[in-house]
């Protein structure tokens, strides 16, 4: 059994700025992944960070770690609301999505019709980028802020039967 812990109060505060009440924070586990795992994964509602990146409190770490936490918590949100992240990741891998990180590349914000049309990694990237902007870690133009509001409207106004979960076979953008 890997070393694991619950979210800290600071991590919950960070997460609430994006996920509000749409995550069961008490159910989230942060785990130290086996040594052979070199990337963070969230296949089952828990987050497994590679050993060198497992921290006692991501809210006390630098900005890149906080953004990474939001990315991984997006997969926990997906899992908690019925999207099988292990299957989504497997399908992306089978389609070459992790070669050159293609699965993470998002279309220009103006070309995204809705949050739900994105694959699981694109959703995580959009929420992590929005977090970076809203927390003041990265500047954004008024137009960019408006695009984020438009894309994330369904996410921020989700309800029990209306969750903008990713598509298993969403498009994969070409490598940049």
Regions found by a protein language model. Name each.
Residues 11, 69-73:
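Structural preference for long, well-ordered alpha-helical segments in enzyme cores
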């Amino acid at each position: 059994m890997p070393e694991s812990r619950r979210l800290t109060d600071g991590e919950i505060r960070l997460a609430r700025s994006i996920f509000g009440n749409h995550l069961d924070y008490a159910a989230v586990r942060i785990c130290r992944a086996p040594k052979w795992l070199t990337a963070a994964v969230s296949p089952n509602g828990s987050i497994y960070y590679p050993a060198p990146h497992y921290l006692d409190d991501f809210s006390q770490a630098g900005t890149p770690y906080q953004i990474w936490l939001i990315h991984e918590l997006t997969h926990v949100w997906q899992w908690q609301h019925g999207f099988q992240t292990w299957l989504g990741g497997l399908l992306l891998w089978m389609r070459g999505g992790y070669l050159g990180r293609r699965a993470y590349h998002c279309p220009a914000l103006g070309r995204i019709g809705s949050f739900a049309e994105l694959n699981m990694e694109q959703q995580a990237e959009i929420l992590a980028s929005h977090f970076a902007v809203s927390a003041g870690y990265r500047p954004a133009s008024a137009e960019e802020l408006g695009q984020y509001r438009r894309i994330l409207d369904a996410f921020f106004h989700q309800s029990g039967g209306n969750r903008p979960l990713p598509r298993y076979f969403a498009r994969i953008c070409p490598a940049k």
